[in-house]
Amino acid sequence: KYPPLKDKFKKYGDSFELVSKNESNRMYCYRRTTPEGIVYFEVFRSNLEKDDNGNVYESYPRSSQFGDTAWCIRDGENAMKKVLKYMQKTFSN
């Protein structure tokens, strides 16, 4: 089972914090900060999962989804433009 999305969490020693979400296309943006203070933005379309009771919830993408429905953008001059572009992406399903 994959855990449901949370506003803040830690994984691999990095801190993740929800920056924004687009309800219409299930796109999320999280700020990922390494212990050294390097900032990335992870933009992705959430996965739909079912819990043991059959309730649907959203989860973080798998590593294999990066480059397809998820992207990691290092903070910098054009980071926000890229984040906005991906946040508005449309999907056929």
Where are these regions (language model features)?
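Functionally constrained cores in energy, signaling, and assembly domains
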Residues: 46, 79, 91
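A short, exposed loop/beta-hairpin motif centered on an aromatic-Gly-Thr core
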Residues: 61-78
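Residue-identity detector for threonine
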Residues: 33-34, 69, 90
